[in-house]
Structure formats: C-alpha cells, structure tokens
C-alpha cells in the first residue's frame, strides 16, 4: 500500500513539474512574441522617421539645386552641381536597402577601401549638403544686407 502511495505522489509531483515547465516555456514564448512585436513596431517607427527625413532632404536638395542653378552659373558649374546632387540622391536611396548598396559599392574593393567606405560616404553626403546650405545662407545674407 505504501508503495502505491509513493508511486502516486511521485507521479503527481512529476506531472506538476512537467506542467510548470510547460507553463514556463509558454510564458517565455509569449514574452518572445511580445518582444518581437515591440521590435517590429520600433523598426516601423524608425523606418517612417527615416523616410520622412529622406523625403525632406530630397525636397530641400532639389530646391537648393534649382535656386543655385537659377543664378548665373557656367554650364560646367551646373553640371558639377547636378552630379553632386545625383550622388547625394543615390546615397539617400541606398538608405532603404543598405545591404544591396554596400554589395554594389564594395565589389572589387580591397579591405582598406572597405574600411574607409563609410567615412567617405559620410563626407560625400554631408560635404555638398553643408556647402549648398552655406552658399544659400550666404546669398540670403548678401541680399538682405
């Protein structure tokens, strides 16, 4: 009789332990699902913000380029400005698909060039933008003064 009770109690303990392990696994999987959903929400918010910033910069760059080109410039200067604007637009478009852009840009490069690629890209984006903004602000100050 005692043996039956020991087996029954052991069986109850084992089944309770199995249920607690199963509940722990379910709560962990639910937590993982919630974390994944929150990460998706954060990514979508980040993508929307990035899209808005990208749209703003594209519009601002086009406006700056049209203002700059309407001033009296030589054809060579206008061509150079348009080339820079196209490069900046390509860089902004590559923000949507960074893996594809980096694959295209790094084909045939050696390791040193790959290491310096990001600093060159930052300079290529920021250099023309800052110079254009400075030029426009300088022109506005001259017109106001």
Swiss-Prot record:
Coiled-coil stretches noted in the UniProt entry, renumbered to this chain: none
Source superkingdom: Eukaryota
Signal peptide interval: 1-18
Location relative to the cell: Secreted
Keyword terms, alphabetized: Amidation, Amphibian defense peptide, Antibiotic, Antimicrobial, Cleavage on pair of basic residues, Cytolysis, Fungicide, Hemolysis, Secreted, Signal
Tissue expression summary: Expressed by the skin glands.
Annotated S-S bridges: none
One of the GO BP terms on file: defense response to fungus
GO cellular component annotations of the record: extracellular region
Positions of the propeptide removed during maturation: 19-43, 74-124
Record-listed Leucine amide modification sites: 144
Family in the record: Belongs to the bombinin family.
Function: Maximin-5 shows antibacterial activity against both Gram-positive and Gram-negative bacteria. The only exception is the resistance of E.coli. Also shows antimicrobial activity against fungi C.albicans, A.flavus and P.uticale. It has little hemolytic activity. It does not possess a significant cytotoxicity against tumor cell lines. It does not possess a significant anti-HIV activity.
Protein name in UniProt: Maximins 5/H4 type 2
